[in-house]
Amino acid sequence: MSERSSCEHGERANEVRSEVHGNSKVSMKSLLLLLSINLVYFVQVANAVGSGALTRDISAVVGGSHDSVWYSEVIAILTALLGIPASQAADLWGRKTILVCLTSCGFVGSLIIAKASSSGTVIAGFAVSGISFGAQPLLHAISSEVVARKYRPWAQGSINVSASLGAIIGLLIGGVLTRHEHHDGFRAYWYMVAGIYAVATVACQFFYNPPPRALESVLSVPEKMRNLDWVGYGFLTPALVLFCMSLAWSGNPYSWTDAHVLATFLIGVLSGVALIVYETSIKKNGMFHHRLFRDRNFALALGCIFAEGMAFHCGNNYFAFEVSVLFATDNLIIGAQYSMAFIALGISAIMSGIWCSISKALRFPIILAFGFKILFMVLMATVSNSFCNTSRIDRDYIRSYDLYRSLGGSIGLAVFNAIFSNGLSSNLGPKISHAVLPLGFPERELLQLIPALAHNDTVALKQIHGISPEIIHAGVDGLLEAYRVSFRGVWLTTASLCLVASIAGFFLRDPTEKFTSQIDAPIAPDTEVVEIKKRTKIPGDSA
């Protein structure tokens, strides 16, 4: 029997033993670990929400507003790129080492953001802090592994509650620190985030002390390196990064026919095609292990989580943007409004945990969740001018879900940016001219009026021939209409994807047989389990 097969038999034996002993309650060690994991998720969401909600405050201080799309984009890209490599490395070198090292990067990156004086430095800070998001699949995996399977809905629900709390507190504190045009308050926000990252890192170091995993103990370093899917990583990186770069650049500042956009887009697409061919025809047990797709639930769940990732990042980046443009309220009010969604998330996470534990079913809450997402997107898309103010296998499952959620987020942000930029550039001129020309404004002055309104340049407005308060008011109405139409394209695109995901949810099969007392990876050996092992001969123990 090979070493790898022996390891797999050993892990299955551990699962059988934990099933025998699976009636025990959740231990204090497991509770402390779950609290630590929840703290990591809390600060990650606070970091991600801040990257979207405080974008305009950061740009107002350091400049480079055209680069601001990369604040959230770099986090989404790194989450997708690092999720599977980090998860596979954790199986080989141990969960704790990878989790602690990656989480500590969030502390360093947050300090860089807080001290930044240019947009490039801010992007670098988000890149470093984005490394911490590579541990996101581990957070879901660990919280599921250390408790009995019948308690998994509660463990996963606690993570969603922590995510909602991180978003709510982040939005409200970020709003307080930056309200009344105090844009420099973003620095204090990321100092706070850095402090929470530090506490979370120390907590994981102290409270997570799992026994060595089978592959961690048996394989040598060269063997561990060979077990990683290096070719797959090599295809995924340019496919995702270049594809997102091309969409981010389209219309901001290059046209689709420009070499910057066209070359990166083609290389990204070709790399993506190469990745698909390699993972389907050549590498059977790489990032996308073929046995994962034997059950239709997995493929359907990937599609749903991809759409959910796009929906989250759409709301995270464009809700505050649209409200600030159309309604002109301060950051605290915007944060309080958006926090309503996360309050609903926390409540629904608890209710879903109760429902799934009692019914042992998942399909209904998934369909219901996408129904509410569609409703949210449609409501945002139908905002009208009358509202505006002119002033192992389970581990492989988990890591793949997080990869596809992050892929949805990174690709979604790039797609949304392309839709919004092209929509705004194509509607800005016609909407403003349609509003001011009937009032007698000279057509030859439109070339000066449109950029002056778009950049809120009051000095340039005063120098335009034929300008008047009535013309300015009408021009602002046209400007807001152009923004509204551009936002509508983003929301409707996301709503369409959520509709497809909700339909896919009807075909999911409820895995009622999976809700058992089995604990896949206890964080410490149990003496009673050892005694059971002595009395019971389990296949694979002698391997």
Task: Describe the residue ranges of each PLM region.
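Cytosolic juxtamembrane N-terminal segment immediately preceding the first transmembrane helix
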Residues: 1-47, 51, 60, 536-539
